[in-house]
C-alpha cells in the first residue's frame, strides 16, 4: 500500500482535505445534542398573543383621558409639534416637514396627505400645488436682535426699542427715561460721594443718578440720621439730623430742597453749586433708509456690543458721524463697550404744525360800532377783495360780508343786489340820523341790515326824497310814503315763504358740500 501511494503522490494529497472534513463531521454529530421539538411551545405562545390582542382591542374601544406613552416633540424629524394629551397620537402627521439642506438652509414643505378636508384637484381638474418652496435665510447674529426701532404689536400698539441696548418699551416716555441710564455723565450727582474711599465705605457705587426721585431717595437714606424704630416708608414724616453737618429737622420731606440744593449745608464740598442743575441730554429722532426711526441722546452714552449686529443702529451711528463736528464721535469705553458722542450732532428738526389754531377773540364795545366811511356816487368803486383783506369786521358788521355763492340757488343777498351801484355803497348809520344835508345830496340810503332784508329795493323807492319835521320833543321824524308801502308789501306770506325756501336750500347745499352728504 505505501508503495502504491508513492506511485501516485499528487492524487493522495488532494484527497487529504476531504478526509479531514469527514472526520470532523462525525465528531460534531456525536457530541452536539439533536434539536428538540418546539411545536408545542410555539402553539402556547401564539395562544397568549391572541389573548393579548383581544385585550388591547377592548382597551382601544374604551376612551382614555391620558395616552399610554409620553408625547415627544419630533418636529424636526417629521413628527407633530404640540399635541393635546387627549388626542390619539397614532394617526397624526405634521402638515409641514422641515429639512436642513447641505448649504445650512432650513427648507419647509407642506405635506398634502396631512391636510384634512383638502381636495386633490380643483374644479378645473388641475392638481393643487402644495409645496411652498420657501427658504429662510441662514442663521446669523442679527436674527436674535430686533432690526427696527419701533414695531407694531398684534393689538395695534407701537413698541419702542432702545438704540443703545435693544430694550423694548410700549410707551415712549419709558424709553426716554431709560436712555438716560446709558449716559456717562448722569443728570444728578451726590455731593458727598468720594471716589477715593474704599468701595465698601462709599455711599454709592458711582454717585450719579439719572432720575431725580432716586437722587432724593439716596440722600434721605444715606445722609440723614433717623431715630430708632423709624420704618423706611415713614421717613418723610419723621424727624432727623443731617449726617454731614448735624443740623436738626422736624420733618425730612423737603430735606433735599431746603438743605442740600439751597446750599445751607455746611458740609458741602467747595465749588458745589447751590442747585444741582440737570444735565441730561435731549433726544434726536433719526430716520434710516428703510423708513425706520431711531431715538439718540445728545449726551455721551454707552453702546452695548450686541447692538452692532443691528443694521438700523449701525446706519444711525453713521448718520450721526456724518452730521457731527469732531473726531471723537465713536470711541472705545472700557473693555468691550463703545461710547457714542452725539453732542455736536446737527439735524434739521421740522416744527410740528398745530392741528388746532386758537382764534383770537375780538373785543367789541357795545356802545361804539365801527363802520367804513360813506361812499357817494362820485367815489371810486372798491373791490370786495380789498374790503375783506383790509377791514377787520366785528360780530355786528356781518352785513359787510360777501354772500357765499351756491350752484343750485341764489341767496337772498344776491337777489337784492342786481345793480352794480347798490353793491358798492357802504353806509354809515350815524349819517342817517345826524346829517340831514347829506340826505338831500345823496338820497340813496340803505338800512344797516340791507343784506338781511327779505325785499328788493328798487331805484324808484330810493329816489324818493326824505322829509324831516321837528316835533316838540326835539326829535326828528321821517315820513316816507313809498318806503311804508314797501314795508307793507314784504309781509306777504307767499313772498316770505319763497325767500325762506331759498335760504333753506342754500344752507342745505352748503352743508352737503362741506360734509359730503346727499340730503
From Swiss-Prot:
<protein>
    <recommendedName>
        <fullName>Transcription factor STP1</fullName>
    </recommendedName>
</protein>
<dbReference type="GO" id="GO:0008270">
    <property type="term" value="F:zinc ion binding"/>
</dbReference>
<dbReference type="GO" id="GO:0005634">
    <property type="term" value="C:nucleus"/>
</dbReference>
<comment type="subunit">
    <text>Interacts (via Region II) with SSY5; protease component of the SPS-sensor.</text>
</comment>
<feature type="zinc finger region" description="C2H2-type 1">
    <location>
        <begin position="160"/>
        <end position="182"/>
    </location>
</feature>
<comment type="function">
    <text>Transcription factor involved in the regulation of gene expression in response to extracellular amino acid levels. Synthesized as latent cytoplasmic precursor, which, upon a signal initiated by the plasma membrane SPS (SSY1-PTR3-SSY5) amino acid sensor system, becomes proteolytically activated and relocates to the nucleus, where it induces the expression of SPS-sensor-regulated genes, including the amino-acid permeases AGP1, BAP2, BAP3 and GNP1. Binding to promoters is facilitated by DAL81.</text>
</comment>
<keyword id="KW-0472">Membrane</keyword>
<dbReference type="InterPro" id="IPR013087">
    <property type="entry name" value="Znf_C2H2_type"/>
</dbReference>
<dbReference type="GO" id="GO:0006357">
    <property type="term" value="P:regulation of transcription by RNA polymerase II"/>
</dbReference>
<dbReference type="InterPro" id="IPR036236">
    <property type="entry name" value="Znf_C2H2_sf"/>
</dbReference>
<feature type="compositionally biased region" description="Polar residues">
    <location>
        <begin position="364"/>
        <end position="381"/>
    </location>
</feature>
<feature type="region of interest" description="II">
    <location>
        <begin position="65"/>
        <end position="97"/>
    </location>
</feature>
<keyword id="KW-0865">Zymogen</keyword>
<keyword id="KW-0539">Nucleus</keyword>
<dbReference type="GO" id="GO:0001228">
    <property type="term" value="F:DNA-binding transcription activator activity, RNA polymerase II-specific"/>
</dbReference>
<feature type="region of interest" description="Disordered">
    <location>
        <begin position="357"/>
        <end position="382"/>
    </location>
</feature>
<feature type="region of interest" description="Disordered">
    <location>
        <begin position="115"/>
        <end position="150"/>
    </location>
</feature>
<keyword id="KW-0597">Phosphoprotein</keyword>
<dbReference type="GO" id="GO:0008033">
    <property type="term" value="P:tRNA processing"/>
</dbReference>
<feature type="compositionally biased region" description="Basic and acidic residues">
    <location>
        <begin position="47"/>
        <end position="61"/>
    </location>
</feature>
<dbReference type="GO" id="GO:0005886">
    <property type="term" value="C:plasma membrane"/>
</dbReference>
<dbReference type="InterPro" id="IPR051643">
    <property type="entry name" value="Transcr_Reg_ZincFinger"/>
</dbReference>
<keyword id="KW-0238">DNA-binding</keyword>
<dbReference type="GO" id="GO:0005737">
    <property type="term" value="C:cytoplasm"/>
</dbReference>
<keyword id="KW-1003">Cell membrane</keyword>
<dbReference type="GO" id="GO:0045893">
    <property type="term" value="P:positive regulation of DNA-templated transcription"/>
</dbReference>
<keyword id="KW-0819">tRNA processing</keyword>
<dbReference type="GO" id="GO:0000981">
    <property type="term" value="F:DNA-binding transcription factor activity, RNA polymerase II-specific"/>
</dbReference>
<keyword id="KW-0862">Zinc</keyword>
<keyword id="KW-0677">Repeat</keyword>
<feature type="compositionally biased region" description="Low complexity">
    <location>
        <begin position="131"/>
        <end position="146"/>
    </location>
</feature>
<dbReference type="GO" id="GO:0000978">
    <property type="term" value="F:RNA polymerase II cis-regulatory region sequence-specific DNA binding"/>
</dbReference>
<feature type="zinc finger region" description="C2H2-type 2; atypical">
    <location>
        <begin position="188"/>
        <end position="223"/>
    </location>
</feature>
<feature type="region of interest" description="Disordered">
    <location>
        <begin position="47"/>
        <end position="69"/>
    </location>
</feature>
<feature type="region of interest" description="I">
    <location>
        <begin position="16"/>
        <end position="35"/>
    </location>
</feature>
<dbReference type="GO" id="GO:0045944">
    <property type="term" value="P:positive regulation of transcription by RNA polymerase II"/>
</dbReference>
<keyword id="KW-0479">Metal-binding</keyword>
<feature type="zinc finger region" description="C2H2-type 3; atypical">
    <location>
        <begin position="240"/>
        <end position="265"/>
    </location>
</feature>
<keyword id="KW-0863">Zinc-finger</keyword>
Amino acid at each position: 500500500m505505501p508503495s502504491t501511494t508513492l506511485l501516485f503522490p499528487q492524487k493522495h494529497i488532494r484527497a487529504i482535505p476531504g478526509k479531514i472534513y469527514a472526520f470532523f463531521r462525525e465528531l460534531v454529530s456525536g457530541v452536539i445534542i439533536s434539536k428538540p421539538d418546539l411545536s408545542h411551545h410555539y402553539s402556547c405562545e401564539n395562544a397568549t398573543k391572541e389573548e393579548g390582542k383581544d385585550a388591547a382591542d377592548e382597551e382601544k374601544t374604551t376612551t382614555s383621558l391620558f395616552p399610554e406613552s409620553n408625547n415627544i416633540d419630533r418636529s424636526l424629524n417629521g413628527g407633530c409639534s404640540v399635541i393635546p394629551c387627549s388626542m390619539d397620537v397614532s394617526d397624526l402627521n405634521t402638515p409641514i416637514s422641515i429639512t436642513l439642506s447641505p448649504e445650512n438652509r432650513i427648507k419647509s414643505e407642506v405635506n398634502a396627505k396631512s391636510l384634512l378636508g383638502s381636495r386633490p384637484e380643483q374644479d378645473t381638474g388641475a392638481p393643487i400645488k402644495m409645496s411652498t418652496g420657501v427658504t429662510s435665510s441662514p442663521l446669523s447674529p442679527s436674527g436674535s436682535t430686533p432690526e427696527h426701532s419701533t414695531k407694531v404689536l398684534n393689538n395695534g400698539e407701537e413698541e419702542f426699542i432702545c438704540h443703545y441696548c435693544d430694550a423694548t418699551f410700549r410707551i415712549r416716555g419709558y424709553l426716554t427715561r431709560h436712555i438716560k441710564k446709558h449716559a456717562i455723565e448722569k443728570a444728578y450727582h451726590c455731593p458727598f460721594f468720594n471716589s477715593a474711599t474704599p468701595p465698601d465705605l462709599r455711599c454709592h457705587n458711582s454717585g450719579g443718578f439719572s432720575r431725580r426721585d432716586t437722587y432724593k431717595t439716596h440722600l434721605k437714606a444715606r445722609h440723614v440720621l433717623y431715630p430708632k424704630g423709624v420704618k423706611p416708608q415713614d421717613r418723610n414724616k419723621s424727624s432727623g439730623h443731617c449726617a454731614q453737618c448735624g443740623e436738626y429737622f422736624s420733618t425730612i420731606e423737603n430735606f433735599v430742597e431746603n438743605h442740600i440744593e439751597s446750599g445751607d449745608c455746611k458740609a458741602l464740598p467747595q465749588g458745589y453749586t447751590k442747585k444741582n442743575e440737570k444735565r441730561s441730554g435731549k433726544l434726536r429722532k433719526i430716520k434710516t433708509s428703510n423708513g425706520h426711526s431711531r431715538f439718540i441722546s445728545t449726551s455721551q452714552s454707552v453702546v452695548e456690543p450686541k447692538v452692532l449686529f443691528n443694521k438700523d443702529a449701525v446706519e444711525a451711528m453713521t448718520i450721526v458721524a456724518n452730521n457731527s463736528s469732531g473726531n471723537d464721535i465713536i470711541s472705545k469705553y472700557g473693555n468691550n463697550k463703545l461710547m457714542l458722542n452725539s453732542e455736536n450732532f446737527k439735524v434739521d428738526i421740522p416744527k410740528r404744525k398745530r392741528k388746532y389754531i386758537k382764534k383770537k377773540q375780538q373785543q367789541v364795545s357795545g356802545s361804539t360800532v365801527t363802520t367804513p366811511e360813506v361812499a357817494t356816487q362820485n367815489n371810486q368803486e372798491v373791490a370786495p377783495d380789498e374790503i375783506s383783506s383790509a377791514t377787520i369786521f366785528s360780530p355786528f358788521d356781518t352785513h359787510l360780508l360777501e354772500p357765499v355763492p351756491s350752484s343750485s340757488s341764489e341767496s337772498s343777498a344776491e337777489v337784492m343786489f342786481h345793480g352794480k351801484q347798490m353793491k358798492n355803497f357802504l353806509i354809515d348809520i350815524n349819517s342817517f340820523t345826524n346829517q340831514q344835508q347829506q340826505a338831500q345830496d345823496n338820497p340813496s340810503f340803505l338800512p344797516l341790515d340791507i343784506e338781511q332784508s327779505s325785499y328788493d329795493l328798487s331805484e324808484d323807492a330810493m329816489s324818493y326824497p326824505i322829509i324831516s319835521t321837528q316835533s316838540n320833543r326835539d326829535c326828528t321824524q321821517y315820513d316816507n310814503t313809498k318806503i311804508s308801502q314797501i314795508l307793507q308789501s314784504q309781509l306777504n306770506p307767499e313772498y316770505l315763504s319763497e325767500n325762506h325756501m331759498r335760504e333753506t336750500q342754500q344752507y342745505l347745499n352748503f352743508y352737503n358740500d362741506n360734509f359730503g352728504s346727499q340730503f
